[in-house]
């Protein structure tokens, strides 16, 4: 995969161990493991971990064509608990985009079983190029 300046420099994603599996405009896959440090008080993956992975996948899917996209809003629905040590994949797709905005949908699921842990939606804004 060619480098993507905006996401290759994502220091939070690097700190959390997020991996870019695939990144093309319109579809991206990010992967991470729900390590012990990412668990909440009831010993399942913290919602912030899943949200951050989905947000990263959204960035991968919208920045892959060379434009700079930033999130202007996002929501998530948690559907089932994500256990410790689960390998999690966030698959982002873009059902709509134009020159200024893109809507991104992300399924967050077990890489092994396909069990869906959460669904995420975001609106991405493309920054204008300097005149």
Regions found by a protein language model. Give the residues of each.
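Extreme N-terminal tail/first-helix region
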Residues: 1-17
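Catalytic strand-loop segment that frames the active site of acyl-thioester-processing enzymes
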Residues: 12-45
